[in-house]
Curated annotation (Swiss-Prot):
Name under which the protein is recorded: Ribonuclease P protein component 1
UniProt key word Disulfide bond: no
Resulting phenotype, residue 95 to A: 75% reconstituted RNase P activity
Species whose genome carries this gene: Pyrococcus horikoshii (strain ATCC 700860 / DSM 12428 / JCM 9974 / NBRC 100139 / OT-3)
Reactions it catalyzes: Endonucleolytic cleavage of RNA, removing 5'-extranucleotides from tRNA precursor
GO MF annotations in UniProt: ribonuclease P activity; RNA binding
Domain of life of the source: Archaea
Pfam families, per database record: RNase_P-MRP_p29 (PF01868)
Result after altering residue 90 to A: 10% reconstituted RNase P activity
SUPFAM superfamilies: Rof/RNase P subunit-like
InterPro entries: RNase_P/MRP_Rpp29_sf, RNP1, Rof/RNase_P-like, Rpp29/RNP1
GO annotation, biological process: tRNA 5'-leader removal
Keywords annotated in UniProt: Cytoplasm, Endonuclease, Hydrolase, Nuclease, tRNA processing
Length: 127
């Protein structure tokens, strides 16, 4: 799209701005030093991007069995890169995250709904 003789990105609504396709196959970029601090008690407040995840239950049967790395998180969705890119709603799934030490943490998606920065401020009952 040209405007004032300058090339600009197409900012049309409902169009993806970032192409995640170039990320597939490059899982090494997700192995950061922060991954070792995830525990069963703090996963609700922790950064989910970069964690390995698998969907173990869902009200939609096509989502069950999806696995890969979380590459983006919005208020209601997780973007998971595995053999392809999946955009999965949080509230209908049960997720199983893998910590760096190999422990598997199962958590219902209803607990994860909300913007990541707002989840830090929210008070939770004992988890």
């Amino acid at each position: 799209m040209r405007r004032n003789s300058k090339e600009r990105k197409n900012r049309a609504t409902r169009r993806s701005q970032g192409s995640y396709q170039e990320i597939i196959g490059r899982t090494w970029i997700f192995r950061g030093a922060h991954r070792g601090r995830v525990t069963r008690r703090n996963i609700i407040w922790h950064e989910l991007i970069g964690l390995r995840v698998r969907i173990v239950g869902s009200t939609h049967p096509a989502f069950v069995g999806i696995e890969g790395y979380v590459i983006d998180e919005t208020r209601n969705m997780l973007v998971i890169a595995g053999d392809r890119i999946w955009k999965v709603p949080k509230d209908v799934c049960i997720f199983e995250f893998e910590a760096d030490d190999g422990t598997k943490i199962k958590i219902p998606g209803e607990r994860l709904v909300g913007r990541p920065e707002m989840r830090l401020k929210k008070r939770w009952k004992k988890w």
